[in-house]
Regions:
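Catalytic loop of short-chain dehydrogenase/reductase
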Residues: 128-155, 160-169
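C-terminal helical subdomain
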Residues: 169, 176, 184, 194-231
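Conserved glycine-rich cofactor-binding loop
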Residues: 14-15
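Active-site loop of short-chain dehydrogenase/reductase
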Residues: 6, 76-77, 122-134, 169-172, ...
Length: 231
């Protein structure tokens, strides 16, 4: 697999999964554009000194103008990988409109706007878009106790499938991965008694994403790929 200096945007690239995705992309020759929330996040990014990493401070990706500025600064975009998001769990009685809108904004609206900008940037050349859904987007009953999160990720999955059909003739392949619980330090702290060995590792999920975004991947569109490990 060779990206050969192809430009790739990775939102959420400074997170645990994002760091693994960026590292894997760098290993196959990509130039990675990583928007960070703050200057401090950019300064702390482990790959910041790699010349093939282009960091920026984008602010809120649910803001259309901010997203358009981000994509306008990337030449000849090949792939856009949308990892930025957030998780909140609460019973519906404790889920007010503010929490619902927060989950929709960080998970669905930000991804929608990035997809929209990516399609515009790829016009006439084709490319790849990879989103991140969740197990709750595919197995609705698993979203009990986190209805706002589950709804936001289900909307993202529907977006992925619908957009894949819309842009297929433009040679833009749109897919998503749907993790269960990824093995990250934060998840281990949150669930100290869980079976960590059953969780998919960040490098394993990253490998799936990098393939879906690659020029070697030619045929799959509209897939929401379960990446559950044994969890």
């Amino acid at each position: 697999m060779d990206y050969h200096q192809r430009h790739v945007i990775v939102t959420g690239g400074a997170g645990a999964l994002g760091t693994a995705v960026v590292g894997a992309l760098l290993g196959v020759g990509a130039i990675c554009h990583v928007p960070c929330h703050t200057q401090a996040e950019a300064q702390g990014f482990i790959h910041r000194d790699n010349p093939a990493v282009k960091l920026s401070v984008s602010g809120d990706l649910s803001d259309q103008a901010a997203v358009e500025r981000l994509f306008a600064g990337v030449p000849e975009l090949w792939a856009s990988v949308h990892l930025a998001g957030g998780f909140a769990a609460a019973p519906i009685g404790a889920t007010d409109k503010a929490l619902l809108m927060q989950q929709l904004n960080v998970n669905f609206v930000s991804t929608f706007l990035c997809c929209r900008a990516a399609v515009g940037a790829m016009a006439g050349r084709g490319g790849r878009i990879v989103n991140v859904a969740a197990r709750a987007a595919l197995e609705w009953r698993s979203g009990a106790g986190m209805t706002a999160y589950a709804a936001s990720k289900a909307a993202l999955a529907a977006l992925t499938v619908a957009l894949a059909e819309e842009v297929a003739r433009e040679e833009i392949l749109v897919n998503a991965v749907a993790p269960s619980i990824i093995d990250t330090p934060a998840n281990r702290r949150a669930m100290p008694n869980a079976d960590f060995d059953a969780w998919p590792k960040v490098d394993e999920v990253a490998a799936t994403i990098v393939f879906l975004a690659s020029p070697d991947h030619q045929v799959t569109r509209g897939a929401v790929v379960p990446v559950y490990g044994r969890a």
